[in-house]
């Protein structure tokens, strides 16, 4: 909270406390609008629902915050070497096809991704807490270094959608 207060003195800050919001992390029929109950690829259907303006209000609100953001700060405890399930579910529901990825490069005809995704121009700072110290989480630690542990998030989620991760 202190960080939010400090940043708020110089910047417009929007926060999301997924637990306090009661955010449902499960991507399902409620995210699909008219396509609910129709067999198919959930991610593609969520993208169609986004394009049709049929995503649930809580997802639309999170997308609006992200669309307006220059900097995304993800703060979470490291659970089983990754983000908590509720945050993973936030990625699944909010970073939809056609919003965060999936646009085709007009010259190449292939999806724009890895630094060229739908959220290009935004940056992220990942802040984690862990129950281990540098003897365990470090270059010579049994768990490996933190950069490697976070690679699926920093590269596979953030960079894929165009968000540059700050060191």
Protein language model features and the residues they cover:
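N-terminal beta1-alpha1-beta2 submodule of the flavodoxin-like/Rossmannoid cofactor-binding fold
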Residues: 1-103
